[in-house]
Amino acid sequence: MSLDASFPWIFSLMSVFLVSIISLIGLAVISMSEERLRRLVLILVSFSAGALLGDAFIHLLPEAAEESSFGMEMSGGILFGILIFFVLEKFVHWHHCGAAEIGECPKAFATTNLVGDGLHNLIDGMIIAGSYLVSVPLGIATTFAVIFHEIPQEIGDFGVLVHAGYTKARALKFNFLCASVAILGAVLVLLIGGQLPGLSQLLIPFTAGGFIYIAGSDLIPELQKETRLGRSAIQLAGFLLGLLVMAGLVFLA
């Protein structure tokens, strides 16, 4: 394997390992009061929504359009991404536990949430690796978007498990094991991508569709629940900052 050919492997595995480490963020919030945690998660969710939409519209879709015209194939890929994430949310009950739900998710949901989170992380690994197969800058931008989304997500997952009766150490362990499934997703795409050169071009619009769905269906509706002017302004600032960070990553190209 040449040095250039090894770049997607090196960067992909480093990135998914970093994403897996994010699952241990529960350590940083164990001592926080529930009210402070709610406020923090709402800010992180707003930033995450901006980052996901920014990656979709500033990085992924322009990259896909450069490789091929914006036709039915790309539109179909975007819609397929939206559909798959909708099905995961609908039938596997994977969803993004927001600030309003910390400490309120039913105990029966915890095990199902772990399964859904594992599938979610598998897809995260696949889309990160698929992005690196296209280019290193695109992979870095997608990794940042995934990380920004994972931070509030993992805090919510940690809260669900603790509320379900898991000890904090056990909750962190299961969160990390679920997050590590991203490594498997990345390896699968890297192995298959070597045999199917067009795979990465299919994953890019799929990823964009998934990011648009997550931001539009899960994150932004969560932000709309906040009606107080001051906190709404903070959320807007977080959302815009997420967009700006993604725009700034354009200069990596």
Residue ranges: model-predicted function:
Residues 1-253:
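Intrinsically disordered, metal-sensing/regulatory segments
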